[in-house]
Swiss-Prot record:
MF term (GO), any: ATP binding
EC number: 3.6.4.13
The Helicase C-terminal domain, residue ranges: 245-390
Motif, DEAD box: chain positions: 165-168
Gene: rhlB
Lineage of the organism: Bacteria, Pseudomonadati, Pseudomonadota, Gammaproteobacteria, Enterobacterales
Protein name: ATP-dependent RNA helicase RhlB
SMART domains, alphabetized: DEXDc, HELICc
Residue ranges annotated as motif Q motif: 9-37
Biased composition (Low complexity): 403-414
Catalytic activity: ATP + H2O = ADP + phosphate + H(+)
Stretches for region Disordered: 396-421
Pfam families the UniProt entry points to: DEAD, Helicase_C
Source species: Klebsiella pneumoniae (strain 342)
Keyword annotations: ATP-binding, Cytoplasm, Helicase, Hydrolase, Nucleotide-binding, RNA-binding
Broad class of the protein's primary localization: cytoplasm
Length: 421
């Protein structure tokens, strides 16, 4: 983590449980990020927090540190049953739930608190086996949590800490009724520590905080600009016919260490994957149609560096903590202005620099004015020479004929740069 992203406030300055301090220091966390420095003084006093901060600013560690400290500092409810977790962390997507669980594991190992994970699409019996042995902190998506609760595999009557992560995304995905269903089965808000974190604290998110929290304190960390000042943004205007060749030419020119390419539909993502895989790139595909086990494997391979490029729909745009993403390509400009911010927020995280390259084609260029109004600035435009675009391209692979991530990255150095002056 870049030192420029940190405050002078140290975790050791707070009266945190010694086991929590030890776990943080083992992971190299000594100084707080701004959102952590704002939230921890409140949660350590037992006050509810609704926090707004740009992605990649340490929200996850803020609520995990608070959760572990609270459980270690407060006894469990009397007569607590084995199917009653003490803390519940809700996330909008299974990928985010898995990531939060991974971030929590070092704290769990240091403190002895048991973790559980519940998400749909895969692993029902495996997840249930862990829950049946009893967990202290349950992390999951609302659908699977409700499923387990209705079958009495879990009971929320002993909950002492609740975290709602990416609350605005919960609304976007239509999960608000599920959230309220789960809250109704917990002790009253006055008997819990409640935390809500979101990229935006819109009216509807504040309304949820008012309903389900106990006089929450609002803390906000506003970036200098919505897109982050460490992200270099660039925009091209290709024709529909030249769009794919421009992307492949830019990949050869930029030669990114780790890139995510976003498109608006799964079919477009599959087409991009086919072109890049045929051209020898180590590329993975992440859409809603990819089986859950394969999704997790692809994310793991991308995180480890076994894949250089991930082609994704917006299912991957929120909550994923993938380190060292150097480039984000918007193959399609998104229809939702907020998705532009969330997409390019995959790069330039935690004080690092990043690059965002967007293609404003004939189909999606109309989305640009609203995006620029939302982010508060114009995206710098670059020109290219159509005659210099790559032409020696193989026929794209079909998804049914190959699996994402197969094949080595092209051997040899990147080709010469082809942009016009």
């Amino acid at each position: 983590m870049s030192k420029t992203h940190l405050t002078e406030q140290k975790f050791s300055d707070f009266a945190l449980h010694p086991a929590v301090i030890e776990a943080l220091e083992k992971k190299g966390f000594h100084n707080c990020t701004p959102i952590q420095a704002l939230a921890l003084p409140l949660t350590l006093e037992g006050r509810d927090v609704a926090g707004q901060a740009q992605t990649g600013t340490g929200k996850t560690m803020a609520f995990l540190t608070s959760t572990f400290h609270y459980l270690l500092s407060h006894p469990a409810i009397a007569d607590r049953q084995v199917n009653q977790p003490r803390a519940l962390i809700m996330a909008p997507t299974r990928e985010l739930a898995v990531q939060i669980h991974a971030d929590a594991e070092p704290l769990a190992q240091a403190t002895g608190l048991k973790l559980g994970l519940a998400y749909g699409g895969d692993g029902y019996d495996k997840q249930l086996k862990v829950l049946e042995s009893g967990v202290d902190i349950l992390i999951g998506t609302t659908g699977r949590l409700i499923d387990y609760a209705k079958q009495n595999h879990i009971n929320l009557g002993a909950i002492q800490v609740v975290v709602l992560d990416e609350a605005d995304r919960m609304y976007d995905l239509g999960f608000i009724k599920d959230i309220r269903w789960l809250f109704r089965r917990m002790p009253p808000a006055t008997q819990r520590l409640n935390m809500l974190f979101s990229a935006t604290l819109s009216y509807r998110v504040r309304e949820l905080a008012f309903e389900q929290m106990n006089n929450a304190e609002y803390v906000e960390v506003e970036p200098e600009q919505k897109t982050g000042h460490r992200i270099k943004e660039e925009l091209f205007y290709p024709s529909n016919e030249e769009k794919m060749r421009l992307l492949q030419t830019l990949l050869e020119e930029e030669w990114p260490d780790r890139a995510i390419i976003f498109a608006n539909t799964k079919h477009r993502c599959e087409d991009i994957w086919g072109h890049l895989a045929a051209d020898g790139h180590r590329v993975g595909l992440l859409t809603g149609d990819v089986a859950q086990k394969k999704r997790l494997r692809i994310l793991d391979e991308f995180t480890r560096g076994d894949l250089d490029i991930l082609v994704a729909t917006d299912v991957a745009a929120r909550g994923l903590h993938i380190p060292a993403v150097t480039h984000v390509f918007n193959y399609d400009l998104p229809d939702d202005c907020e998705d532009y911010v969330h997409r390019i927020g995959r790069t330039g995280r935690a004080g690092a620099s990043g690059n965002s390259i967007s293609l404003a084609c004939e189909e999606y260029a109309l989305n640009l004015p609203a995006i620029e109004t939302y982010i508060g600035h114009s995206i710098p435009v670059s020109k290219y020479n159509p005659d210099a675009l790559m032409t020696d391209l193989p026929k794209p692979l079909r998804l049914t004929r190959a699996r994402p991530g197969n094949g080595p990255r092209r051997n040899g150095p990147p080709r010469n740069r082809r942009r016009s002056g």
